[in-house]
């Protein structure tokens, strides 16, 4: 789909920022020229592609704060015929600004009377705001030296939004997966990234106060809290180590449920995203507590993506592996084709226990839709695995 969902955008920016920060990825195979509005693949321009991608996503996030002073749920076409459009996304609109004074077929080259412009949904959401500023704070660190002006704007925006949200009651409007996660989870993300970016003890204090959130959703937050250990006191570190010991017993339960040793989701959307996040968490835990969390708990996540899973042995990363996903729901879905490097949701467990991933029908979104946030987290995971293999 071509909806621009803010939650997706800030996940991508965060994952890519962490990947650049932790692995110093310097690949350059893309030319990006903002002035000319031109992108050319396989044409190096002397700039790391990942920084250009982070910059692009960050500009989308910061534009919301510049315009409205907050994050917004997202942008999407207004008409169902556009939503089900199967061709090039460029042709979903006439790319002209709508003018209600014009007839539907009238245009002056800049505006038209065709009511096809995308809509921005602007509901207030404190959790969404926190998720957005977490990404902006992370981006500010890696954009220093690359786009200093944007980096400075990002961290200042993040600090100011944090202050504003803590000066009032939270806006808790919630709709689907467009308004952020829970208030506590998103606030914790923001606190962690702001602590890493500013070193301000205020955020460390708030993180300590939020221990119940860390404890309750350890599978969600384990990786990020490992990054801030140097800023935390001994009491926090000890509580964290004790929680890792409990977590070690929890992940052993996965081996009882399935032979792959990973958490296979049973909801209406297949669980590759959850499995990748699980493996990334285990990477950070292994780096901090190698005596408690074995590196195999990281490898299992990538092994699952590459074919060690129910239903088949196909790789869920298109173009990677001897047999990979070749029919997927992406920009070229009408052609029953694929995009190399795209990651699909994977095996869906049909109730009660039937694993399914159709290899010949791209339109089952929950099995075969590429989503960019999983692509970004995959980039992190594959580099994490390479790091472990190179340092055995």
Regions found by a protein language model. Name each.
Residues 1-10, 19, 44, 79-131, ...:
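Aromatic (Trp/Tyr) and acidic
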Residues 13-20, 31-40:
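General structural concept
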Residues 16-24, 58, 62-65, 136, ...:
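Sec/Tat-exported extracytoplasmic proteins
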Residues 19, 54, 61, 68, ...:
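Alpha-helical solenoid scaffolds that mediate protein-protein interactions
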Residues 25, 29-36, 57-60, 67, ...:
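Long, compositionally biased, intrinsically disordered segments
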Residues 26, 68, 146, 172, ...:
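Alpha-solenoid repeat scaffolds
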Residues 38-53:
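Acidic, glycine-anchored loop motifs typical of Ca2+
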Residues 125-129, 133-143, 151-198, 213-232:
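Aromatic-lined, polymer-binding surfaces characteristic
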